[in-house]
Amino acid sequence: MTNIRKTHPLLKIVNDSLVDLPVPSSVSSWWNFGSLLAACLAVQILTGLFLAMHYTSDTATAFNSVTHICRDVNYGWILRYLHANGASMFFICLYIHIGRGLYYGSYMYSETWNIGILLLFAVMATAFMGYVLPWGQMSFWGATVITNLLSAIPYIGTDLVQWIWGGFSVDKATLTRFFAFHFLLPFIIAALVMVHLLFLHETGSSNPTGIPSDPDMVPFHPYHTIKDILGILMMLTALSMLVLFSPDLLGDPDNYIPANPLNTPPHIKPEWYFLFAYAILRSIPNKLGGVLALVLSILILAIVPLLHTSKQRSMMFRPLSQCMFWLLVADLLTLTWIGGQPVEHPYIIIGQMASILYFTIILLLMPLVSMMENHLLKW
């Protein structure tokens, strides 16, 4: 008798995606981050759902409702900190996942890669809107500064900003709509994840060598199910340590001050995971130029497949390209550090140099080094 998981219309889809899926045997732990992201999304949706049951999206009561969750709701404090720090874990996994894609040439599967970029934008938008909801000082001023960037768009900019605000400043209407979108977007992200996986399973997974691995496959279950569960347990352990020992480590103390439109904080900055893009934005003195650089710093990922000049897919056997990759990682860490610093000497010039280097590495140095490696290998 045939196993039901192979014949049942619904179970068959699950079986082909999670049980009998052929996976290259050389796939390393860097391929774990997809499942970790799925786990992060599940944690965020669950904790967010319970938080939404107690939260009120009104400027008069939003801050107090978050305080109420932490003080009066059973285990509300752990829900709130799991959700806030879960976002940090989400972005750590997200950036490593993208880094893996760049290092091992996963971007050559262009459909999967492009849906991934769309997912990145959706997650960033969700995180930004979520940061506004506690209605602290940094929530209010972060929302004001970031939405105001759209006013740099010629002709329609000012109208667009007021349309997003629902008035002439960030106020009750803004908070209400941000809560609505923050609740809705994770479900859209979950749907996009399905499309992401659909495209991935059309081509099959890449592997560290970058060489076709059709003759050497292993089934997803039990090998990768065990591997993924171990990864998820390690991530949840790290998240639990963060939540239970230093829940405010990655947050901003200013967000414990209720939003006050009459008092601007000395240093307005986003959460740590946006600091690299914020540093690029600030490094250009012109408003429109800064906004364009900000958008391009993420959108540049879309043209990475076009800049692939190497005859090899992966960087595994390309030491010069590896140097360029790690230089890019160091540059992004520098930008993250600069984004959290005040706008003064020497931080301004360091930020400008790091921003120029970021675009130079991706657009110029990586393709040139790849061509040089081709020449050295006489290809």
UniProtKB/Swiss-Prot annotation:
Chain sites annotated for binding heme b b566: H97, H196
Effect of I98V: In strain: Isolate TK 15571 and Isolate TK 25127
GO BP: mitochondrial electron transport, ubiquinol to cytochrome c
Primary localization class, coarse: mitochondrion
Binding site for a ubiquinone: H201
Result for mutant: M353V: In strain: Isolate TK 15571 and Isolate TK 25127
Cofactor or coenzyme needed: heme b
Gene Ontology terms for molecular function: metal ion binding; ubiquinol-cytochrome-c reductase activity
Annotated heme b b562 binding sites: H83, H182
Keyword RNA-binding: no
Alphabetically ordered keywords of this record: Electron transport, Heme, Iron, Membrane, Metal-binding, Mitochondrion, Mitochondrion inner membrane, Respiratory chain, Transmembrane, Transmembrane helix, Transport, Ubiquinone
Compartment(s): Mitochondrion inner membrane
Keyword Cytoplasm: no
GO cellular component: mitochondrial inner membrane; respiratory chain complex III
Signal peptide span: none
SUBUNIT field: The cytochrome bc1 complex contains 11 subunits: 3 respiratory subunits (MT-CYB, CYC1 and UQCRFS1), 2 core proteins (UQCRC1 and UQCRC2) and 6 low-molecular weight proteins (UQCRH/QCR6, UQCRB/QCR7, UQCRQ/QCR8, UQCR10/QCR9, UQCR11/QCR10 and a cleavage product of UQCRFS1). This cytochrome bc1 complex then forms a dimer.
General remark: Heme 1 (or BL or b562) is low-potential and absorbs at about 562 nm, and heme 2 (or BH or b566) is high-potential and absorbs at about 566 nm.
Function (record text): Component of the ubiquinol-cytochrome c reductase complex (complex III or cytochrome b-c1 complex) that is part of the mitochondrial respiratory chain. The b-c1 complex mediates electron transfer from ubiquinol to cytochrome c. Contributes to the generation of a proton gradient across the mitochondrial membrane that is then used for ATP synthesis.
Annotated protein name in UniProt: Cytochrome b
